[in-house]
């Protein structure tokens, strides 16, 4: 019989429209833009091949393995509505292609070399269905939403945070002072900026010590549990763990990691340490837009969010929705549900291509941050619900009277919105009124309302959904 050398079309082996997917398969939805003259079936099959067992030519060693058992299969292709020459190619991967408990290995296969493939003009991974059998090989978030609430003793409302600004240049002592002011005023958390690691103007240990002092002082004064996301991100995993150990020894409740710049291997390492040592883990998504911003190439953020839930994190930044378009609201809420819920149904209108069952893997709190202030509070409370962290950087520190009054303004606004919602009022319609009413009793809130009043509150249109 021998082996037949030469190049043959991918679609002869890797395009299998009759294939019925298995419960154990990892399923991927790719947005494929083929080069002119390349049929969509060939492009979809090429993606399946190059991200699994295939190479550009038939090789002698193919005969030593069972391709049927190990190959990725393109099992369905559909054109993208409203786009010329774009297709969604669905690919199924057998579970045995992946190392257990390794997001790194999963991504190396699925979004590895295939993205540089010449027969495609562009390629984007839109969604991933992770089978329950693979999920069970991951630890996931160190603690999850319920355990975090129990640790903090805070229920029935979103949590409030604030990123300390200016992000670079403060000394450790002044940094700790800013942390203390915010926490004393009523915030639950303050946050290291993602690019604060250990620079000449503020070495990490000095920052950790002053922030710990700020936390304890604020806790003593307010009777509430407080936290500061101590950024443990470092140049090596060893250094990162050293910083996490120091945070634990200081009694800090939470550390932070930049999971995309740090990498999934480092992130999973830190997540395991955090669970073993009772630390919460806040995740920042710096660099995500490099990967997810192009509509036709890269990877959608919902895939990065799913990967983070597997790798491990208790909070992750997830956009704000406010003031953006309605489609974005639906799509953002789609991946917010993928982060928090145990079971999410397929829903293409929200960008969810597959039904995802998380089999009791703990959930992740979505963090809304970036350009938000007190007037956005009703919208944020309505959109994100209780299980979220609302982070106001400039919206706290930009208060004309200083950090603590800025924190007071945000806390009063939040409590007013939660109370109004619990009384059955419609936050979408009455949001402005609720904030105005509350500001009569809080001079701090009134001052904040005055500063940011020019920034429009674009919310009523949301009712049309």
Swiss-Prot record:
Residues annotated as the enzyme's active site: 165 (proton acceptor), 284 (proton acceptor)
Residues that, per the record, bind substrate: 113, 163, 167, 285, 317, 369
Residues where Mg(2+) binds: 191, 193-194
GO cellular component entries: chloroplast
Record PTM N6-carboxylysine, positions in chain: 191
UniProt enzyme class: lyase
Keyword Metal-binding part of the UniProt annotation: yes
Cofactor: Mg(2+)
Co-factor note (free text): Binds 1 Mg(2+) ion per subunit.
The entry's keywords: Calvin cycle, Carbon dioxide fixation, Chloroplast, Disulfide bond, Lyase, Magnesium, Metal-binding, Methylation, Monooxygenase, Oxidoreductase, Photorespiration, Photosynthesis, Plastid
Gene3D superfamilies cross-referenced by the UniProt entry: Ribulose bisphosphate carboxylase, large subunit, C-terminal domain, RuBisCO large subunit, N-terminal domain
Example GO BP: reductive pentose-phosphate cycle
MF-aspect GO terms: magnesium ion binding; monooxygenase activity; ribulose-bisphosphate carboxylase activity
Stored InterPro entries: RuBisCO, RuBisCo_large_chain_AS, RuBisCO_lsu_C, RuBisCO_lsu_C_sf, RuBisCO_lsu_fd_N, RuBisCO_lsu_N_sf, RuBisCO_lsuI
Subcellular location: Plastid, Chloroplast
Modified sites of kind N6,N6,N6-trimethyllysine: 4
Similarity field: Belongs to the RuBisCO large chain family. Type I subfamily.
Other comments on record: The basic functional RuBisCO is composed of a large chain homodimer in a 'head-to-tail' conformation. In form I RuBisCO this homodimer is arranged in a barrel-like tetramer with the small subunits forming a tetrameric 'cap' on each end of the 'barrel'.
Function of the molecule: RuBisCO catalyzes two reactions: the carboxylation of D-ribulose 1,5-bisphosphate, the primary event in carbon dioxide fixation, as well as the oxidative fragmentation of the pentose substrate in the photorespiration process. Both reactions occur simultaneously and in competition at the same active site.
Subunit details: Heterohexadecamer of 8 large chains and 8 small chains; disulfide-linked. The disulfide link is formed within the large subunit homodimers.
Protein name according to UniProt: Ribulose bisphosphate carboxylase large chain
Species this chain originates from: Clitoria ternatea
């Amino acid at each position: 019989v021998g082996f037949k050398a030469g190049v043959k079309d991918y679609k002869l082996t890797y395009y299998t429209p009759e294939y019925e997917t298995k419960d154990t398969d990892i399923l991927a939805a790719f947005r494929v833009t083929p080069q002119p003259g390349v049929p969509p079936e060939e492009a979809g099959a090429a993606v399946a091949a190059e991200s699994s067992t295939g190479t550009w030519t038939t090789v002698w060693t193919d005969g030593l393995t069972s391709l049927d058992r190990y190959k990725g299969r393109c099992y369905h292709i559909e054109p993208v509505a409203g786009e010329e020459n774009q297709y969604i190619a669905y690919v199924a991967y057998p579970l045995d292609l992946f190392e257990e408990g390794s997001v790194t290995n999963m991504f190396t296969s699925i979004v590895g070399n295939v993205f540089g493939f010449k027969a495609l003009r562009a390629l984007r991974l839109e969604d991933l269905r992770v089978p329950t059998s693979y999920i069970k090989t991951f630890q996931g978030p160190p603690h999850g939403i319920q355990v975090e609430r129990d640790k903090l003793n805070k229920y029935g409302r979103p949590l409030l945070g604030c990123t300390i600004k200016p992000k670079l240049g403060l000394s450790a002592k002044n940094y700790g002072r800013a942390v203390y002011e915010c926490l004393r005023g009523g915030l639950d958390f303050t946050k290291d900026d993602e690019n604060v690691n250990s620079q000449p103007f503020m070495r990490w240990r000095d920052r950790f010590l002053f922030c710990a002092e700020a936390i304890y002082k604020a806790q003593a004064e307010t009777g509430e549990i407080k936290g500061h996301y101590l950024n443990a991100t470092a140049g090596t995993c060893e250094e990162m763990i050293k910083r996490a150990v120091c945070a634990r020894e200081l009694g800090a409740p939470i550390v932070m990691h930049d999971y995309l710049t740090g990498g999934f291997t480092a992130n999973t390492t830190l997540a395991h340490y955090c669970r073993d040592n009772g630390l919460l883990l806040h995740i920042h998504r710096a660099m995500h837009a490099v990967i997810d911003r192009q509509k036709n190439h890269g990877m959608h953020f919902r895939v990065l969010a799913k990967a983070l839930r597997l790798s491990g994190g208790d909070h992750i930044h997830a956009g704000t929705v406010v003031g953006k378009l309605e489609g974005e609201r639906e799509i953002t809420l789609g991946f917010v549900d993928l982060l928090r819920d145990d079971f999410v149904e397929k829903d293409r209108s929200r960008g969810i291509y597959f039904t995802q069952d998380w089999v009791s893997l703990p959930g992740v709190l979505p963090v809304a941050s970036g350009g938000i202030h007190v007037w956005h509070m009703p919208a944020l409370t309505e959109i994100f619900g209780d299980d979220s962290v609302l982070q106001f950087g400039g919206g706290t520190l930009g208060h004309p009277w200083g950090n603590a009054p800025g924190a007071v303004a945000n806390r009063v606004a939040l409590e007013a919105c939660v109370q109004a919602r619990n009384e059955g009022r419609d936050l979408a319609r009455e949001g402005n009124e609720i904030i105005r009413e509350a500001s009569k009793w809080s001079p701090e809130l009134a001052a904040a309302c005055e500063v940011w009043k020019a920034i429009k509150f674009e919310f009523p249109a949301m009712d049309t959904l």
